[in-house]
């Protein structure tokens, strides 16, 4: 089990309360697909992903980005039980979708960039450290069924 300090919990939940899940989720997934184009193969059913403009304007990317970040909110609400919180999603991504677990780490890194861009004043080095820890823990929980 991961140990969270009171300060880490406050930094995570405080920033999360300001996050526009639809906007930041859409941006994070779009950035993942643009920066790491090989991840697009998992989203073939989303239609046109042929250019950054197409990806940014794709309503399915926006909707799924919101869904992904909404799910990430479950981690924020369950900091002391992230492994179990993501158990079913880990199984889905491993057994049915066959997603490379490295992609979870990549998305976490992208989320850090999105949060820093949206909340530059609040995203102090201490806040970044707490969020880096959180995205690592979430990525590990999502990759759990692969082991």
From Swiss-Prot:
Heme b binds at residues 64, 93. Disulfide bonds: none annotated. Residues 3-147 form the Globin domain. The keyword Glycosyltransferase does not apply. One of its GO terms (cellular component) is haptoglobin-hemoglobin complex. InterPro entries: Globin (IPR000971), Globin-like_sf (IPR009050), Globin/Proto (IPR012292), Hemoglobin_b (IPR002337), Hemoglobin_oxygen_transport (IPR050056). Pfam families: Globin. SUPFAM superfamilies: Globin-like (SSF46458). One of its GO terms (molecular function) is hemoglobin binding. GO terms for biological process: cellular oxidant detoxification; hydrogen peroxide catabolic process. Red blood cells. Keywords: Heme, Iron, Metal-binding, Oxygen transport, Transport. It comes from the Eukaryota. PANTHER family: HEMOGLOBIN FAMILY MEMBER (PTHR11442), HEMOGLOBIN SUBUNIT EPSILON (PTHR11442:SF7). Heterotetramer of 2 alpha (or alpha-D) and 2 beta chains. Belongs to the globin family. Involved in oxygen transport from the lung to the various peripheral tissues. The beta chain is a component of adult hemoglobin A and D. This is Hemoglobin subunit beta. The lineage of its organism: Eukaryota, Metazoa, Chordata, Craniata, Vertebrata.
